[in-house]
Amino acid sequence: RNLGKVIDTLTCGFADLMGYIPLVGAPLGGAARALAHGVRVLEDGVNYATGNLPGCSFSIFLLALLSCLTVPASAYQVRNSSGLYHVTNDCPNSSIVYEAADAILHTPGCVPCVHEGNVSRCWVAMTPTVATRDGKLPTTQLRRHIDLLVGSATLCSALYVGDLCGSVFLVGQLFTFSPRRHWTTQGCNCSI
């Protein structure tokens, strides 16, 4: 909505300036005013569409886009094995974002290697950032988190504090509140 005020000022100011041109000002000013009204209609449509989504507004959309900056786009990992450095794509502990019983959320560019019992084995990458133990995506735990996020977004929208809640969610991405459930190592040399 704030961006719309800037665009309105520019387009309407341009239309006024066009009206002051001698001889051709009247037709050019009218055309520029029509263009400014068309831009205003588009702005109103975008404001209506983004303002009526539960828990979303255009500024929340921009904050969500900026949240992509908190996760690296690609990575390579190096481990020190008896004085030698090996390039591996096994996730180090610093790349693990969230752990569930059967799924691990990690940064892109690596695959978790989990030590269970006396053996370390690679988990199956379902997406660039999600790996599971057996290649099946568990839905029970995901549904619980999705329900919590959707409920929070709806409540924030109903209380008209969507921007504040969006900011809190983004700051929350910087902190992990869940304990470690798996022992991840870098001894598997998993393939992506």
From Swiss-Prot:
The chain crosses the membrane at residues 53-73. GO terms for molecular function: RNA binding; structural molecule activity. One of its GO terms (biological process) is fusion of virus membrane with host endosome membrane. Residues 6-57 are annotated as: Interaction with APOA2. It holds the Pfam family HCV_core. Residues 48-51 are annotated as: Important for lipid droplets localization. Residues 62-75 form a propeptide. GO terms for cellular component: host cell endoplasmic reticulum membrane; host cell lipid droplet; host cell mitochondrial membrane; host cell nucleus; membrane; ribonucleoprotein complex; viral envelope; viral nucleocapsid. Glycans are attached at residues 80, 93, 118, 189. This is Genome polyprotein. It comes from Hepatitis C virus (isolate EC1).
